[in-house]
Amino acid sequence: MQFTESSLIPGLKTIQPPVFHDYRGEYIETFNEGRYSFTDRHGRPIRFVEDDVSISRNHVLRGLHGDEKTWKLIQCLLGEIYVVVVDMRSDSPAYLRWES
């Protein structure tokens, strides 16, 4: 599992899970509680409690909304995705910075 920390937005991480290949195809572990032991900016553990799937038609723009208690694990299962993240934490040194 490869983790990359954002240089623009503190706390933003990109996770690249390993892909296991064999004669049957590919296997990717999308979530494992033991591997995702993150804390928020106050040092409190982050607990993954909900998993959702969104299926969009071509050229659809969706907005993701968050708050202090919510974090997002975003993955593209098929096709392409263009993700833009904006730091909306008003007390963050990266306030209103964005990354895509």
For the regions a protein language model found, what residue spans apply to each?
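Non-catalytic, conserved peripheral segments adjacent to functional cores
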Residues: 1-100
